[in-house]
Swiss-Prot record:
<dbReference type="GO" id="GO:0010181">
    <property type="term" value="F:FMN binding"/>
</dbReference>
<dbReference type="InterPro" id="IPR018517">
    <property type="entry name" value="tRNA_hU_synthase_CS"/>
</dbReference>
<dbReference type="Pfam" id="PF01207">
    <property type="entry name" value="Dus"/>
</dbReference>
<dbReference type="InterPro" id="IPR024036">
    <property type="entry name" value="tRNA-dHydroUridine_Synthase_C"/>
</dbReference>
<dbReference type="InterPro" id="IPR004652">
    <property type="entry name" value="DusB-like"/>
</dbReference>
<protein>
    <recommendedName>
        <fullName>tRNA-dihydrouridine synthase B</fullName>
        <ecNumber>1.3.1.-</ecNumber>
    </recommendedName>
</protein>
<comment type="similarity">
    <text>Belongs to the Dus family. DusB subfamily.</text>
</comment>
<feature type="binding site">
    <location>
        <position position="139"/>
    </location>
    <ligand>
        <name>FMN</name>
    </ligand>
</feature>
<keyword id="KW-0819">tRNA processing</keyword>
<keyword id="KW-0285">Flavoprotein</keyword>
<keyword id="KW-0521">NADP</keyword>
<feature type="binding site">
    <location>
        <position position="70"/>
    </location>
    <ligand>
        <name>FMN</name>
    </ligand>
</feature>
<dbReference type="GO" id="GO:0050660">
    <property type="term" value="F:flavin adenine dinucleotide binding"/>
</dbReference>
<comment type="function">
    <text>Catalyzes the synthesis of 5,6-dihydrouridine (D), a modified base found in the D-loop of most tRNAs, via the reduction of the C5-C6 double bond in target uridines.</text>
</comment>
<keyword id="KW-0694">RNA-binding</keyword>
<dbReference type="GO" id="GO:0017150">
    <property type="term" value="F:tRNA dihydrouridine synthase activity"/>
</dbReference>
<dbReference type="InterPro" id="IPR013785">
    <property type="entry name" value="Aldolase_TIM"/>
</dbReference>
Length: 321
């Protein structure tokens, strides 16, 4: 699949997730088979750009693959400025967030709240597309409520404004992450526009990936929550799409290697004083299958030292040897 001048190595994309898809996680997903990874959402509000969190999110160099940065906001001028600044910092694709259902984001008329205002959507899209010389993509939901699914209208508008690819999550804003994603709306959009369509929502295993591609006709898949603690899902899905066969479960030794590498990278990226806090949620996701009683996770979450975290993980996996 192509996005503008860029040829993706496959049709699997790691979704942008706030507080999760930082550079260490994106790098790991790429190494585990993702064809593209998208950064955490960056606010277009320049007042927050000086925070430590924003400064780290604006570091786009020294990572593999096509550097794709997602921006969020509701002011067309601010969004255009944010796009320009991120391109100057190394972004090769700009993705616009109109899919986030979080109240904190929607209260500022950003994310999926924008779907109620097609005229504002148009102004933002035109502003960003005209501001940069790299491809601009868009992520949306199917609408703002089940009775107000307007993704076909937004998709056609996006194509007219010069958007190079469109990701659709198969729920409305009102649905949050409740219930099941639906793919009829994504299929309808695919039949109405010619830009690449990326299907998103509840793609949790290779069989589901194949089924969603076949049903919607989508050009690619975006995977988010299913990759938390399981970044090798991209490799599993790609192997199944290529061969029709399932890979065997990842050996425990490989899980250990990936987890410990990920934790070290988090310590290095955020600094040991903060990295150990960020690592806690990732370790919890990795070990959901292996530590169902939560005892180790509770013990691990009480550790307040980076090196002690790594020692605890070594001891934990030794018990399985």
């Amino acid at each position: 699949m192509r996005i503008g001048q860029y040829q993706l190595r496959n049709r699997l994309i790691a979704a942008p997730m706030a507080g999760i898809t930082d550079r260490p996680f994106r790098t790991l997903c790429y190494e585990m088979g993702a064809g593209l990874t998208v950064s955490e959402m960056m606010s277009s509000n320049p007042q927050v750009w000086e925070s430590d969190k924003s400064r780290l999110r604006m570091v786009h160099v020294d990572e593999p693959g096509i550097r794709t940065v997602q921006i969020a906001g509701s002011d067309p001028v601010e969004m255009a400025d944010a796009a320009r600044i991120n391109v100057e910092s190394g972004a090769q694709i700009i993705d616009i967030n109109m899919g986030c259902p979080a109240k904190k984001v929607n209260r500022k008329l950003a994310g999926s709240a924008l779907l109620q205002y097609p005229d504002l959507v148009k102004s933002i899209l035109i502003g960003v597309v005209n501001a940069v010389d790299v491809p601009v993509t868009l992520k949306i939901r199917t609408g703002w409520a089940p009775e107000h699914r307007n993704c076909v209208e937004i998709a056609q508008l996006a194509e007219d404004c010069g958007i190079q690819a469109l990701t659709i999550h198969g729920r409305t804003r009102a649905c949050l992450f409740n219930g099941e994603a639906e793919y009829d709306s994504i299929r309808a959009v695919k039949q109405k526009v010619s830009i690449p369509i990326i299907a998103n929502g509840d793609i949790t295993n290779p069989h589901k990936a194949r089924a969603v591609l076949d049903y919607t006709g989508a050009d690619a898949l975006m995977i988010g929550r299913a990759a938390q603690g399981r970044p090798w899902i991209f490799r599993e899905i790609q192997h199944y799409l290529d061969t029709g066969e399932l890979l065997p479960p990842l050996p425990l030794a490989e899980v250990k290697r990936l987890l410990c590498t990920h934790v070290r990278e988090l310590h290095d990226f955020y600094g040991q004083a903060k990295g150990y806090r960020i690592a806690r949620k990732h370790v919890s996701w990795y070990l959901q299958e292996h530590a169902p009683d939560d005892q180790f996770r509770r013990t691990f979450n009480a550790i307040e030292d980076a090196s002690e975290q790594l020692e605890a993980l070594e001891a934990y996996f030794e018990n399985f040897a």
